[in-house]
Amino acid sequence: MFSPLTKRAKQSSRNEKTPRNRVPPPDSPVTPATQNRNNFISDRPATGTPAPWAPRLSVLARVSPGNNGDKGVDSDQLKPVFVGEFPQLLRDEQSYPGDACVSGGMDKETCLSWFITGSKVFVWSHLTTLPSRKCVVLELPVVVLVNEESGSGLQDGKSWLVNVVSWDTSAGAATRASRSRSPVGVVMCNRKTRAVVYWSDIFSGQEAAPAEKARHLIKRQSNGIRSSRAENSDLNSLITTAVAAAERLCIAIACSSNGELWQFTCSPTGVKSNQVQLNISSSSVSEGYPRSLIWRFSQGLARESCWEFLMLTDCDIHCFTIEPYPDLTVSEVWQHEIVGTDGDSGIKKDIASQKQIWPLDLQVDDQGKVITVLVATICMDRASSSSYTQYSLLTLQHKSEMRFADGREEKVLEKQGPIQVIIPKARVEDKDFLFSMRLRVGGRPPGSAIILSGDGTATVCYCHGSSTRLYKFDLPYDAGKVLDASVLSSTDEHEYGAWTVLTEKAGVWAIPEKAVVLGGVEPPERSLSRKNSSNERSTRDETRVTPYGVDRTAGRENSDIQNIEDKGNPKMGFTRQTARDEESEALLGQLFEGFLLSGKVDGSLEKLSQSGAFDRDGEANVFARKSKSIVDTLAKHWTTTRGAEIVAMTVISSQLVEKQQKHENFLHFLALSKCHEELCSKQRHSLQIILENGEKLAAMIQLRELQNMINQNRSARFGSPQAGSEDQVSCALWDLIQFVGERARRNTVLLMDRDNAEVFYSKVSELEEVFYCLNRQLEYIIRADQPLGTQLQRACELSNACVTILQTALDYKNEHQMWYPPLEGLIPWHSQTVVCNGLWCIASFMLHLLTEASRIDISAKSDIYTHLEVLTEVLLEACAGSTFAKLEREEENKGLLNEYWTRRDTIFDSLYRQAKEFMEAEIQGIRERTEATDEDIFRNRCSNLISIAKRHAGYKIMWKICYDLNDTGLLRNLMHEGVGPQGGFSYFVFQQLYDMKQFSKLLRLGEEFQDELLIFLKRHSDLVWLHQVFLHQFSSASDTLHTLALSQDEESMTTVEERTGPEPEDVQPTFADRKRFLNLSKIAYVADKDADSESKVKRIEADLNLLKLQEEITKALPNGEARNRLFRPEELIETCLNIQGRWTAIKAFEVFAWTSSSFRENHRSLLEECWRNAADQDDWDRHHQASTNEGWSEEETLQNLRNTALFQASKRCYGPTRVNTFDGDFAQVLPLRRENPEDSTSSVEDVLMSHKDFAEAGKLMLTAIMLGCVEEEGIVAEEFSSPME
């Protein structure tokens, strides 16, 4: 697609097998500078700077933006970024002449690169800034380097397939930063001889495992395979995975061009091979297939029970699984046709213009859900009758995770979208070139892929919507070919990393996302190789137009790409600005530089306002961006060649001080120009960011001083000759700096050529990343296998660093308080969730160390206790700030508040327990002990804890300390100081006394805190009456007791929100409690001597009778059912009706009798139902027959009817001895009989008339109710006649 920047020299001299003299080749990047050398590169400097000679972007970033702000998209931003040099051992090996053909590769999981030259294999981490320190050189055994037929040595590095096996089973990108220290194995397999070499742990220095030459694998031919294919049976692909990490056992799967699939079991004792029998017909597989193998899931997501891998053939994708037990059996799970007659499932063949379809390679995303296939299609142009190649990407996704039974014809995959054509018309290449192409996915920008060709080119394809952009990675010619590409693993889970490229001679490079998005061009009609084509421009013309092979104008034509960049990506370190923003930022830079020179700010506010400098708020504001550029400036004289020694340089401290001075001048510029007032009123967030940059810069300076002090202390401690310098430099803070710098380098590839420490001390505005890495990487900074004393020391170092950062930031804020805008609703950076989580991570680890009481001496525990005490204060301040900001913004903060309370109480409880242990230890060391001495020791130990608890409402620990000291004076002082919402600490103390049932102490203490006591009593009504009695408010106390006795479940006792500890499941007052409350209420009414006290007392007595009735009635209910629950009168009556009995039928009327007339009026229908139920309790037809046959006299009638339910109900409700005589009678609601037949009022007689036996026994029914309502003496039966007569 693109051509190299510089025209390449003729290759004849470079292809000579024997060099003319034994000197390094002239194109070696490490060739020493010589003044008399023939420089055939015009722009190459005489200093021997490694290729390419153009300045690196990170160096150009030091230039003031004012110099190039008017150039649009800077071409330097579209260049690749240098990541790391080759290890020096590899450079030395490259300097020797020879005819060996080199090869190399990169592993995404372990971030390791490997390079084969001659008989040596170099393996190193391409992330470290000093690769030479971690470079491992592996020697290939002689037995695998001898060709059996010719006896010559095999020096072709391209004949080897290499895979790295990670024994670290941890999942996620967050742990990959530490994998360079983890043990890894290497498996190598020769494409031609099938020889396998295995190193189980390359970092341990052990020898290679016995190599299997596998002669029978070469000569053996499977059934159905022609001899011509057997000759071309090179292995195409190799994949490996760990089986048992402890035993260093792994398996490797390889596929060959003759359709065979081989399985190798590798262990430290040897390598075993086994051919996998495929169920596909060998004759149906085209020559050169299967092409590639790949695991369906990444190592972190792979299931331990089995492993699945995919195999690409000329028309299908096959999925296989490996069952680890009992003998690592490989079996096919499913297959999916990608080239066939069904265009919906893949690529439709037999189209008129198609001649041949070549699936070249496939890749799977990290989640194992999306499969991408690189496809080359040979087509015929009907107009010119010429052939051309069309390159495209086929994207498939899994429909489900189901496994299908044998013979079941269902599609497992489906097309994610239409096939994406990346090059519509290209030159027709030979088969070997097509098969040399490789595909990589998973890099930035999301959705992009990189295509590697056999001649050493790399092209990034970025498809966005209907648009496709191609970016060609190209360096000056002496960089050599591109050997492999990978993804720079991000430190964030489920995030994409930048593309990294391994070159033949220029080390490792990265392709920034911005370069791909802005520097990509439309797909041309040309090949992906370096060869020229008839329809492309000359190389010389192309290089004159596009530096580094990038057409800048084409990169800005597509509006979709620009829309993506307008949103920006802060983690990448760039945001697309409008022309107005760029003008404003340039103007601000000029005005500020003028202020630094002259001290004048004439008209700055008006000029900046007209330029739109105040249009944006937040990080996009030009003032905030200027502040960020000041604090994040890279020093010109910082280099990456000195590695860890950079921490000893005073230049870091002086550079930070220079930044601080410049930032202070920037604040003064804002104040004098009145821009500060404008920002304070309109862009509060922007002003907050500016001042927080000052906080972070001050904190970074103090952190640097802390590191200097740690280094000095360690130097004094390890000053003996036996101590190594590496031990002196290594400390917890240094390791944390490395992790933070590494994370910044990964997220911003423009910094990949910088040292971790340099990046850390330069990226001041991202200081909160310290706490992110502390939360994610603590287990690697403080390892479990380290001695306990070392863990303690490193934990204290990290705690001290965190406290230094936050305390310095708060001090800066206090000193510049007048500069800050109103912060309502703004979350400070030191109160963000990432900071709180990082602080809690180290605090919880220190709490864990404190629990190791038996293994830690008292002095070490005292040291960590002191550090934890200080750390607790800054942790709680951070959590409180986050919670209050959420509250001010009226956002949901319940979860955050609960987390804050939990962390606070956990730390306080642990610190208090430890303080008591220290007190006991101190007391044991005193010969003359007194009670006062013990108390003083205890107070001194707890003084700091009380101080912190007061500021963060640690009421629980404050109460414990006062209770254990038995100090009422201290308790009262804290109650006066602990003022807060809902009564503050006083409310908590009252609650504790209430739970302990010390009511008298509670009320006596409440005399001093009356307002707080009233708040408490509103939620504890069972104590209100006691307070009212104490104030001689007897009437109010009686009403309170009466209400309390009849309170329902949801109203009784303490509300759930106010409970501070676990409550019993049954917190309802019992019947005995309710009776006691009612009796106390009656006593209080009598003591009040109110004129209306008699009626109130009768009402109380009625309620007592209702309680008694409920006790009697609920005895008939099943055991335990609502025994203590207070029934409402209507519920009690309905219960009586449901029980269906004579006794309960009569009790229902008694319940009515003890209620009020208003209740009876409101429940008239329920009363009528009670009368119907009472009539049903007797056999009135039998009574009628007996009275007729036996001729009952008046006395016999009375004797027989007085036992009926109707008689008893009438007697209790209407008789002279009725139950309730003070609140009206039943006749007002439901009379026995209507006095006036024309009256519409219902009566008991009307209710009974609906009874089934009323027609015959109606007279007896009426007689029963009328007999019950009068005196029994002198009854005249004839007076009661039925209206039916």
Swiss-Prot record:
InterPro entries (UniProt xref): Nucleoporin_Nup133/Nup155_C (IPR007187), Nucleoporin_Nup133/Nup155_N (IPR014908), Nup133-like (IPR037624), WD40/YVTN_repeat-like_dom_sf (IPR015943)
Recorded GO MF terms: structural constituent of nuclear pore
Subcellular location: Nucleus envelope; Nucleus, Nuclear pore complex
Compositional bias (Polar residues): 31-41
Broad class of the protein's primary localization: nucleus
Protein name, per record: Nuclear pore complex protein NUP133
GO biological process, one term: protein transport
GO cellular component terms, A-Z: nuclear pore
PANTHER family named in the record: NUCLEAR PORE COMPLEX PROTEIN NUP133
Keyword terms of this UniProt record: mRNA transport, Nuclear pore complex, Nucleus, Protein transport, Translocation, Transport
Spans annotated as Disordered: 1-53, 522-580
Compositionally biased intervals (Basic and acidic residues): 523-544, 553-569
Gene name per UniProt: NUP133
Highest taxon of source: Eukaryota
Protein family: Belongs to the nucleoporin Nup133 family.
Subunit structure: Part of the nuclear pore complex (NPC). The NPC has an eight-fold symmetrical structure comprising a central transport channel and two rings, the cytoplasmic and nuclear rings, to which eight filaments are attached. The cytoplasmic filaments have loose ends, while the nuclear filaments are joined in a distal ring, forming a nuclear basket. NPCs are highly dynamic in configuration and composition, and can be devided in 3 subcomplexes, the NUP62 subcomplex, the NUP107-160 subcomplex and the NUP93 subcomplex, containing approximately 30 different nucleoporin proteins.
